[in-house]
């Protein structure tokens, strides 16, 4: 960019002088309309479990979650993203509980849509909450995650959620071809209006630790890793190829995960494809901000709002954030 004019004729501070002019020239704005609130749901009645590594975040049974959903609706938050905490007795090598029509997720989806039909409900399509080994797919005898065999289970899982009333299914597993397989399954069953939010650029990040504690998969995964299917944090061009493939297979929206450490990817995706682009402010990002605020090192409100503004400035149309309720309250003034 070539600057026009010379100092003192050109003074950039002139438009920064007063609040009204700063507001008039503001390029990016955060509103409650961009928030998706991730929630952890567990079996039982009246149950609340604090997530130690995520201060302020709780695992909630359905009756408690309904109260949380009501608060979200009243604050104007458009959607919740559900993540189940599955009892260890239901975790198997074949992840059969993932497509149980009477399972936790379909029951929660049905209840949420019955009570709050205007609230968007997004479900996670992946097998790690359901496998005894904590991987996102089926494995062979060596522990390698099997791609094509996993697709069949993911398709059943997505259809199970759609038939329960999920507005959006969000495959986060990073198997090749899963968007096309899921779209075909949904279409064949007549679920043509179920949207797919593809975790297209999901990196094998170190920032997921608290989330795995929250859903109870950390212990199952142990010292294992997800390098053979999640993306290398060093790569950017690969992310564009992943997004292009998912869109060609039938994705309606795409996701970049994690968020703040990968805002360069958000910008590249938005510039290249100009499709609905979402980013996830993941558990590790949340935990870092919370820890700094609790130690008095950062102003929590100011830093949370600035971090969310960074997502918008990078090109994100929506943000999954554990700060959604707090941020919505902040924005009310």
Report each predicted region and the residues it spans.
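Alpha/beta enzyme core
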Residues: 2-7, 18, 31-36, 42-333
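N-terminal carbohydrate-binding accessory modules
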Residues: 12-30
């Amino acid at each position: 960019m070539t600057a026009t004019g010379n100092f003192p004729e050109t003074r950039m501070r002139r438009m920064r002088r007063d609040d009204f002019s700063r507001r008039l020239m503001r390029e990016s704005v955060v509103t409650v309309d961009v928030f998706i609130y991730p929630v952890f749901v567990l079996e039982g009645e009246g149950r609340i479990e604090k997530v130690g590594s995520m201060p302020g975040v709780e695992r909630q049974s359905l009756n408690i979650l309904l109260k949380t959903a009501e608060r979200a609706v009243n604050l104007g938050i458009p959607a919740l993203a559900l993540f189940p905490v599955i009892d260890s007795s239901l975790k198997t090598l074949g992840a059969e509980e993932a497509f149980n029509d009477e399972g936790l997720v379909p029951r929660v989806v049905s209840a949420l849509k019955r009570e709050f039909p205007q609230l968007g409900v997004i479900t996670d399509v992946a097998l790690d909450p359901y496998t005894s080994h904590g991987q996102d797919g089926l494995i062979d005898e060596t522990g390698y995650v099997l791609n094509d065999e996993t697709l069949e289970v993911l398709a059943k899982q997505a259809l199970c959620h759609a038939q329960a009333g999920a507005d959006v299914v969000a495959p986060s597993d990073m198997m090749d071809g899963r968007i096309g397989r899921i779209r075909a399954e949904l279409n064949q069953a007549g679920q043509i209006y179920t949207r797919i939010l593809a975790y297209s650029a999901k990196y094998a990040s170190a920032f997921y630790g608290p989330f795995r504690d929250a859903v109870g998969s950390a212990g199952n995964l142990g010292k294992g890793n997800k390098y053979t299917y999640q993306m290398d944090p060093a790569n950017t061009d690969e992310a564009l190829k992943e997004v292009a493939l998912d869109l060609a297979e039938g994705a309606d929206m795409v996701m970049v995960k994690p968020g703040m450490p990968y805002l360069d990817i958000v910008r590249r995706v938005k510039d290249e494809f100009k499709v609905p682009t979402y980013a996830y402010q993941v558990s590790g990002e949340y935990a870092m901000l919370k820890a700094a605020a609790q130690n008095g090192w950062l102003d929590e409100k100011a830093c949370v709002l600035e971090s969310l503004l960074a997502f918008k400035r990078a090109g994100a149309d929506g943000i999954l954030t554990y700060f959604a309720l707090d941020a919505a309250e902040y924005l009310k003034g």
